[in-house]
Amino acid sequence: MRRQLSFHESTKRSLKKKKIRKIEKPSLVSKTSRDKNASITDIHEEDIEAFSDEENKIVHLNNLKEDRFQLWFEKYIPQKAADLAVHKSKISAIKQWMLTDSLESRLLLICGPSGCGKSTAVQVLAKELGYSLIEWLNPMNLKEPSNQESDTLSLTEKFSRFMSLCETYPELELMDSNNIQKRGKNAQGKKKFIFLDEIPHLSKFNGSLDAFRNVIRTALTSRGAFSIIMVLTEIQLNNLEGINSQDRNSFNSVQIMGNDLLQDPRVTVLQFNPIAPTYMKKCLGSILRKEGVPKSPKLLSLVENICSASEGDLRSAINSLQLSISQSFEKKGTKNIREVKEGKGKGNDFSLEAAQVLERLSKSDSEAYARFKNYKSAYIPKSDKNENSFFKKDVGLGMMHAIGKVVWNKREGDDEVLKASSQQTGNSERIKGVKVSKSQENKNCISLKSDQRERMLNVDQCFTSKRRSLVDIESTINQSGLSGSVFRYGLFENYVDSCVTTDEAFNVCDLLSISDCLSHDFPYSYTGDEISTWFSVQGTLFYLPSPVPRKWRQLRFQQWNNEGIVRGIFDDYMVIYGKRSVSDPVIEAHEDQVLEDIDDPIEDED
């Protein structure tokens, strides 16, 4: 017989049941059908799909936020050697050096201007070959408040320690079946290289430059496990500071490494050139296709102008293209922004964000936006021909380019004169396929210039016979990156090949001698040096023949490399006493040759 429960027992048992219900696990359901008391078996398949779709949307939005402000040159880094905008010979040279990796060549020095793909080529080839790079990065000098002595080493000392650790403590080296030591490989057989993409801040006055050279020299002589790949960006800045400006602003392989290291047989030097326009157009076109930008004649013109204005710097061209595309969203207005939001139009997140900010500023009476509009109207030309000059890279002409503009002496009407001369001499022979020797071409040029040589003897007739020059003297001198004395020395080495007669060579040589006498070494006068350089350039352009015989030749500047080496020995003495400009060329180029010091005017007074 079932015993009847008392009221106390029944209430106690009901409380236990309620407690058991409370500790049940809550179920995962969709937002529309949430119920805390539902069990796990109540979840439907539609709810699981909705939950996963919502999760994917959140991940996609996070990725968009990360890529919104990403620069294109970082977003579209080449992943294969075939995608590099570098000449195939340069790529094959780096690849062959990395595959060989012999003790006879311990250092690969890659030099070139900025944005020509030096570091990218090394990283892509290392990844493609399965090699790893031990990269040196300049550390930040940060000190903890609790420990002020935690970072007492200088940057040069840190670099020396890094190189010594790489050479002293390499990874485990294995032996193959023939007991031959595998050089430069780790325990997994993966080859490694020391990659110096950045170098410490160097100065010859505090000894850091000499310390850097000693570290590299020690690494070459040691029998370490890893070879070294160094990337050096060469810079030639405008000479606008007068004395010592060329020595302090220049940044090339000769001044950093030194002549003894560059001539070392264990050092391989590879010179990179600026990116060719064909490679640059191909790269920019690929980026535009990936970004979904539609083709148009205006876009093609924009790419052409950016390629011509970037001076072979691919990184600068990509940044200019990204900035130009972002400005196009501002001109199109709110319609494109709405289309991109609704998914009807194509566009990148960076351009969308920039257009939204500009739209918000344009609707408000903001002083910043007013200044922005005034800035655009003042500094961006409105003509179609120069509409992209705002993105032009501020670079110099370069040493050889500036000297070449002078010695080639281009004037108005040169093409017509050359065309008329080709019709008068040997043009019929070239049509038939008969080659003309260089001596015959020189004789033809001399015969064609006979009337000009007669006019050169009379100065009055010479003034009236010269056509207008196409060389801008001021921009050529300012963008050469050379001091006045070095620029005059470059003209002195290269003017002879442009002359046809001895009279022309005599006149140019006499004028360069007079211009050299106009400048003073002590006391140094920047105005006098500038006037002397103007006089030498203008006189050389005046006395050279027009047109200059068109033939292939290589410009020479033999003393430039030696100047950077020998000049460093006497920098301190020249700066203190002001005897001469540090940037003046030193004719005595041999290091073992003893140079006589200039007489001290203070000692002469005694």
Curated annotation (Swiss-Prot):
Keywords linked to the UniProt accession: ATP-binding, Cell cycle, DNA damage, Nucleotide-binding, Nucleus
Residue ranges of the region described as Disordered: 1-21
Gene Ontology annotations of biological process type: DNA damage checkpoint signaling; DNA repair; mitotic DNA replication checkpoint signaling; mitotic G2 DNA damage checkpoint signaling; mitotic intra-S DNA damage checkpoint signaling; telomere maintenance
UniProt-annotated binding residues for ATP: G112, P113, S114, G115, C116, G117, K118, S119
Location(s), subcellular: Nucleus
Segment forming the signal sequence: none
GO MF: ATP binding; ATP hydrolysis activity; chromatin binding; DNA clamp loader activity
Matching Pfam families: Rad17
Keyword presence, Nucleus: yes
SUPFAM superfamilies: P-loop containing nucleoside triphosphate hydrolases
Gene Ontology cellular component annotations, sorted alphabetically: chromatin; chromosome, telomeric repeat region; nucleus; Rad17 RFC-like complex
Record's function text: Participates in checkpoint pathways arrest of the cell cycle. A mechanism that allows the DNA repair pathways to act to restore the integrity of the DNA prior to DNA synthesis or separation of the replicated chromosomes.
Family stated for the protein in its record: Belongs to the rad17/RAD24 family.
Subunit structure comment from the entry: Interacts with mug40.
NCBIfam families, per database record: rad24 (TIGR00602)
Protein name from the UniProt record: Checkpoint protein rad17
Organism: Schizosaccharomyces pombe (strain 972 / ATCC 24843) (Fission yeast)
Organism classification: Eukaryota, Fungi, Dikarya, Ascomycota, Taphrinomycotina
